[in-house]
Amino acid sequence: MNDLIKDLGSEVRANVLAEALPWLQHFRDKIVVVKYGGNAMVDDDLKAAFAADMVFLRTVGAKPVVVHGGGPQISEMLNRVGLQGEFKGGFRVTTPEVMDIVRMVLFGQVGRDLVGLINSHGPYAVGTSGEDAGLFTAQKRMVNIDGVPTDIGLVGDIINVDASSLMDIIEAGRIPVVSTIAPGEDGQIYNINADTAAGALAAAIGAERLLVLTNVEGLYTDWPDKSSLVSKIKATELEAILPGLDSGMIPKMESCLNAVRGGVSAAHVIDGRIAHSVLLELLTMGGIGTMVLPDVFDRENYPEGTVFRKDDKDGEL
């Protein structure tokens, strides 16, 4: 947080901290699931800022849970070992050989690196995966390409979440860092899209919020038209435009939609290229990204006059 306000005057600093108070009160003892991805995973300064954000949330009483993918790192390792990477319908084609790399990179590299960064602040983070204690159960996913169901290998969808062991980690005051690989009932291990996994997990554990880090400012309804950026959208509105979105954004917005329809109070798509973007979205009036709301949103738990988004008037949504 110091990085956010170090260049501000004393009065402005005080106002920034005071502005965060209702949000700090609201998120105390609440679970916040954060999907870690994009530039925040590859830029050293952004990685450090993200880790600090998770510790900040934990220190003020929230219960952060991190779900991560590892696309750039997987692609780099595939190139190093001479394996061809291929995508179909926005998903990585995952042969058994590619799956070995995915498994190694997600849990053995990306997850361990993030656990280490968080634990540089104290003994907070615990690495785990969808394989551990039956957290996720998956089934094979077929991708629709030009109307044709297409086999993309060991890519799965989550069909069950057993979060009992994960809740033990959370209730012990730790920060779970979840790698998105999962066993299927057929005995295979599947590569799970991290956006999809984060949304499913958030709904299953009764999270208050889901945040998805991206490399853009939020949801553009007509990418790349910058004027089409929206600061908030309700579930039915999102569902209507989902098929026409940019292919890279569809899994992220689908995850948000499923989360809010699964009981999560709101989901957020935020720009992971901004240091401390998680804190800026959760703890400042108006936020910085796009907020996805259920069709009926209960404001009674928030102080009167709370401004959720920058273009709200009198706190209305």
Curated annotation (Swiss-Prot):
EC number: 2.7.2.8
Pathway membership: Amino-acid biosynthesis; L-arginine biosynthesis; N(2)-acetyl-L-ornithine from L-glutamate: step 2/4
Site residues (Transition state stabilizer), renumbered to this chain: K35, K252
Enzyme class: transferase
Main location: cytoplasm
Binding site for substrate: G70, G71, R92, N191
GO cellular component annotations of the record: cytoplasm
Gene3D superfamilies (alphabetical): Acetylglutamate kinase-like (3.40.1160.10)
Keyword Magnesium among UniProt keywords: no
Gene Ontology biological process terms, A to Z: arginine biosynthetic process via ornithine; L-arginine biosynthetic process
Primary role: Catalyzes the ATP-dependent phosphorylation of N-acetyl-L-glutamate.
Sequence similarity: Belongs to the acetylglutamate kinase family. ArgB subfamily.
Protein's name in the database: Acetylglutamate kinase
Species this chain originates from: Corynebacterium glutamicum (strain R)
